[in-house]
A protein has these predicted regions:
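Amphipathic alpha-helical packing segments from all-alpha helical-bundle domains
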Residues: 25, 29, 57, 75-102, ...
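Hydrophobic/aromatic residues within well-ordered alpha-helical segments
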Residues: 12, 19, 23-27, 50, ...
Length: 156
């Protein structure tokens, strides 16, 4: 019944945001777990690995790609919590990776926002429709662009 629904959710958008947050948190949880099993020599390698792992998961599940990409706003992303990892936020994963590098960055949240939005926007058509290039071609360019963004925001 409609009344029962509102005991758990504010409105239909609340349930959608919670579903998106749940699915997105699982993507990041898997990517972070896989990243921890590997060894990297640079911050760039870690970030690129994390991003590529998420992209590969979305490529394997196109329905999830459609659902998440159309509805994942920055406000939702920046507050997604990963319950299997002590309820940390997805943003905390990025903060931890950046902190481990012992490098300083200006406007970290803006930098992460730009990476997330770049990847989300550019992968949509490539994953779902195979245009304007293959996913492997796009990932090669994204890798360079992500490294460039990290360099651009680094404080010397």
């Amino acid at each position: 019944a409609k009344g029962t629904f509102y005991l758990y959710f504010k409105d239909k958008y609340d349930i959608r945001h919670r579903l998106i947050a749940n699915k997105a948190s699982r993507l990041f949880e898997r990517a972070e777990e896989a990243m921890r099993k590997e060894e990297f020599s640079t911050l760039e390698e870690k970030v690129v690995f994390l991003v590529n792992h998420v992209v590969d998961q979305l490529n394997e599940n196109k329905a999830l790609m459609r659902f998440i990409s159309k509805n994942l706003s920055w406000a939702v992303f920046s507050h997604i919590r990963i319950s299997n990892m002590g309820n940390i936020k997805c943003m905390d994963i990025f903060d931890e990776i950046l902190g481990e590098s012992n490098r300083k960055f200006r406007q970290k949240e803006l930098m992460i926002y730009m990476i997330v939005e770049l990847v989300s926007a550019s992968c949509y058509s490539v994953i779902l429709y195979g245009t304007p290039c293959s996913l492997e071609e796009l990932k090669a360019e994204l890798d360079k662009t992500i490294c460039g963004l990290l360099k651009q925001f680094e404080v010397e």
